[in-house]
Amino acid sequence: MIEEKKELKKRRVLQMARFYGAAAFTLITMRLISRAIKVRKYVPSIFQQNYKLPPFSQRNEAMSALTYASAASIGTFSTLIFGFCWALDISTAREFVFKTREFMSLPQALETDTSMDEETSKLTKQLQDLLSSENNK
């Protein structure tokens, strides 16, 4: 009983750490995005034209925007997922499947159909052979 409580506490602390880590990543990313937007803002001085754009590289701007957008979406969705898992006490993907099936009122299947077609089994065997030959070197 005491061991179960310790295990549950350790599990909840791990879930909390994941959530707060994802939230911190999201906040840092959003702060970087805000700073990047402020830097790019063009404020002309008294004798400069209002419509003159500062020189910039389109490739660098596109890469920067893609990086910031990707980091923001990854951070937001990871915070959402880890918060959901923390609230519902989910630690593994298998638990997530069971809770989702329970939520959608689907029958629980302990054994899933893991049969493969012929092409998939050949590909799996080739990959396993390749990985085992790399490990032997």
Curated annotation (Swiss-Prot):
Disulfide bonds: none annotated. The chain crosses the membrane at residues 20-37, 66-88. Its main location: membrane. Keywords: Membrane, Transmembrane, Transmembrane helix. Present with 1835 molecules/cell in log phase SD medium. PANTHER family: ALTERED INHERITANCE OF MITOCHONDRIA PROTEIN 11. This is Altered inheritance of mitochondria protein 11. The gene is AIM11.
